[in-house]
């Protein structure tokens, strides 16, 4: 399990600038997929060959204008509760503020690494002006300019050295790992209890990697499954005071460890922006995805209602057209059996491997029927394709212009592979590599 680093601080101190600096320019295919939120406030980062999840808590601030100190308290509480390491950012141009001082006092009581960062220090003149911050009595303060990349590498070397070693517990590869994610009060807790209770599980709780986490094994139709962080789902499902926008943080750890993710949506409330944000991370993490529309029993409906709701999901989650949709009532148990049927189906596709000959038969025909657009006035040539991984299915395509393949053509190729081989419920990864040789089309 990857460690989680939270960036906290009052608005406009440069949290987002530091976040973007550390994330860098993402080259993943997802960047060009329609519907994926561009203003992400969480990301997978690899620094000095160490992977971690980075959270910009500034992105979780309420849109309405609340009191500044209240916002800072909420951000800091989030960091203290969820993160493995905290970067507390202050503004070197504004100087030390009373709000900064209060949060520092809160962070002194945290039993995890805290790094105190003074941003917007662009040169020696600003460095000298940052002396006020040393009055906090903190042993080490890092002065940086996130905008100009000054001091950032030195900071991150220390941060990486301080990260805890997050080793995930060994899990039987034959077990399908399921994460249940969604906004507060969509019925995750009831759904989990139903799944465990209906299947008459004899649970063997094992400690997970998250705080107070319990993973629960259960059996269904002679197969073994692992529900991730069931204690966390139950506990957090009862917490009403937690700000809704923070709920995405609760999902990150579970998604990282899952094979298949159940994205729970409230039928009464419909699809919200937060739903798309949480689902987007499951997609980017490359997990099998199933939409579970809960509370279907609680709404007035007619013969067209289900079709209308499906269209709404497909419109709002354009990057997940392959994900099955199940309509259930966790409260009554209606259609719950359909969930496990879909889990088995998605897991089979998630781990599917296609032979190179079959793959190239479909690929060659796709290229012949629809050539790639010209790149810098030259034709993009393709040589062959081969599957290099599963969970999710990952395919390398050799070409003379790996940078010249438009994202729309990537989608075309993926859709042709899906038409031929299925891959229902699972993302697919395409990687284009350069090679000279005999072309396929």
From Swiss-Prot:
Signal peptide: none annotated. Residues 3-167, 176-351 form the EngA-type G domain. InterPro entries: G_ENGA (IPR031166), GTP-bd (IPR006073), GTPase_Der (IPR016484), KH_dom-like (IPR032859), KH_dom-like_a/b (IPR015946), P-loop_NTPase (IPR027417), Small_GTP-bd (IPR005225). Keywords: GTP-binding, Nucleotide-binding, Repeat, Ribosome biogenesis. Belongs to the TRAFAC class TrmE-Era-EngA-EngB-Septin-like GTPase superfamily. EngA (Der) GTPase family. GTP 2 binds at residues 182-189, 229-233, 294-297. It holds the Pfam family MMR_HSR1. This is GTPase Der. The gene is der. The lineage of its organism: Bacteria, Pseudomonadati, Thermodesulfobacteriota, Desulfuromonadia, Geobacterales. GTPase that plays an essential role in the late steps of ribosome biogenesis. NCBIfam families: GTPase_EngA, small_GTP. It comes from Geotalea daltonii (strain DSM 22248 / JCM 15807 / FRC-32) (Geobacter daltonii). Associates with the 50S ribosomal subunit. Residues 352-436 form the KH-like domain. The keyword Repeat applies. One of its GO terms (molecular function) is ribosome binding. GTP 1 binds at residues 9-16, 56-60, 119-122. It comes from the Bacteria. One of its GO terms (biological process) is ribosome biogenesis. SUPFAM superfamilies: P-loop containing nucleoside triphosphate hydrolases. PROSITE patterns: G_ENGA (PS51712).
């Amino acid at each position: 399990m990857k460690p989680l680093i939270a960036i906290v601080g009052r608005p406009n101190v440069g949290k987002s600038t530091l976040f973007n600096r550390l994330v860098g320019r993402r080259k993943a295919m997802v960047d060009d997929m329609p519907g994926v939120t561009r203003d992400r406030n969480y990301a997978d980062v690899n620094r000095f060959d160490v992977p971690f999840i980075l959270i910009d808590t500034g992105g979780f601030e309420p849109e309405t204008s609340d009191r500044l100190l209240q916002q800072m308290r909420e951000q800091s509480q989030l960091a203290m509760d969820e993160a493995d390491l905290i970067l507390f950012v202050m503004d070197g141009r504004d100087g030390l503020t009373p709000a900064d001082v209060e949060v520092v006092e809160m962070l002194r009581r945290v039993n995890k690494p805290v790094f105190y960062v003074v941003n917007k220090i662009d040169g020696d003149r600003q460095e000298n002006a940052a002396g006020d911050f040393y009055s906090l009595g903190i042993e080490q303060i890092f002065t940086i300019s996130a905008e100009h990349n000054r001091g950032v590498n030195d900071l991150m070397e220390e941060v990486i050295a301080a990260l805890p070693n997050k080793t995930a517990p060994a899990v039987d590869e034959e077990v399908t790992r399921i994460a249940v994610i969604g906004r507060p009060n969509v019925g995750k807790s009831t759904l989990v209890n139903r799944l465990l209770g209906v299947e008459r599980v004899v649970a063997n709780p094992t400690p997970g990697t998250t705080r107070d986490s319990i993973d629960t094994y259960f059996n269904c139709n002679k197969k073994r499954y692992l529900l991730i962080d069931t204690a966390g789902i139950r506990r957090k499902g009862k917490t009403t005071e937690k700000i809704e926008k923070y709920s995405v943080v609760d999902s990150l750890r579970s998604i990282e460890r899952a094979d298949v993710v159940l994205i729970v949506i409230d039928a009464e409330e419909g699809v919200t922006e937060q739903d798309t944000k949480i689902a987007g991370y499951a997609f980017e993490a490359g997990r099998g995805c199933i939409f579970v529309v809960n509370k279907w029993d609680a709404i007035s409906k007619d013969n067209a209602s289900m079709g209308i709701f499906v269209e709404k999901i497909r419109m709002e989650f354009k990057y997940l057209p392959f994900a099955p949709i199940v309509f259930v009532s966790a409260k009554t148990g209606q259609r719950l059996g359909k969930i496990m049927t879909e889990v088995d189906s998605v897991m089979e596709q998630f781990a599917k491997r296609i032979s190179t000959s079959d793959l190239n038969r479909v690929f060659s025909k796709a290229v012949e029927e629809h050539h790639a657009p010209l790149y810098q006035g030259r034709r993009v040539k393709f040589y062959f394709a081969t599957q290099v991984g599963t969970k999710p299915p990952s395919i390398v395509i050799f070409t003379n212009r790996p940078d010249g393949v438009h994202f729309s053509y990537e989608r075309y190729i993926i859709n042709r592979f899906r038409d031929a081989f299925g891959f229902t419920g699972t993302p697919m990864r395409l990687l284009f590599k350069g090679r000279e040789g005999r072309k396929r089309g």
